[in-house]
């Protein structure tokens, strides 16, 4: 991730965060699912199932040469501890709800129901995030709340928030979830799905 001056005579980086350079690599930032929150922090999922929050500017708005990592949570490991089981899907995407809870989903672009992979959806509480950002230690065993859908169900690039909670689209259903000291399923609407479609010539479908 980098901040670049596109108006300069020569495009230069004003600040950056590079896992390969700063931490020896081993993971990538999922930049397509990253965003800037109301604190002006970059919130990003990673390829090794962590959620990071990065401070990219100082109090005057000047870019920091090296972004400061102010939060780092292994969300898959935290979810596995809460569930007491192994998750076979990786962290896909994240979103804040209107109460400041950070929702997360596991999944991918091709989740096949018949393969029975176990995934999860849930949230890190607003209180835990505030504690960590203030320099404290949060009890993630009690501040990470998880719902495990049926094996073979996982998110496929669909997560958003609204005043009522978090809307999550999986390969089998659409959910409205609400944070209530746990994951409250307000509603679940299923639809027919058999995984990726065959996209060979003449199949009349794309993808696969």
Ranges and model annotations:
Residues 1-208:
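Secretory-pathway ectodomains
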């Amino acid at each position: 991730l980098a901040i670049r001056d596109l108006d300069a005579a020569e495009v230069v980086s004003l600040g950056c965060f590079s896992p390969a350079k700063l931490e020896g690599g081993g993971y990538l930032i999922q930049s397509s699912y990253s965003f800037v929150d109301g604190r002006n922090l970059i919130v990003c999922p990673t390829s090794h199932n962590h959620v990071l929050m990065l401070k990219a500017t100082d109090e005057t708005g000047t870019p920091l040469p090296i972004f400061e990592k102010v939060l780092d949570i292994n969300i898959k490991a935290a979810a596995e501890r809460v569930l007491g089981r192994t998750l076979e899907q990786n962290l896909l995407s994240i979103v804040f709800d209107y109460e400041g809870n950070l929702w997360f989903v596991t999944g991918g672009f091709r989740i096949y129901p018949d393969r029975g992979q176990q995934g999860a959806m849930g949230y890190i509480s607003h209180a835990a995030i505030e504690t960590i950002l203030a320099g404290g230690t949060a009890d993630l065993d009690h501040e990470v709340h998880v719902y495990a859908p049926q094996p073979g169900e996982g998110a496929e690039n669909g997560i958003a928030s609204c005043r009522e909670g978090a809307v999550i689209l999986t390969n089998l259903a659409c959910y409205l979830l609400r944070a209530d000291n746990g994951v409250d399923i307000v509603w679940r609407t299923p639809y027919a799905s058999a995984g990726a479609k065959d996209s060979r010539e003449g199949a009349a479908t794309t993808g696969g």
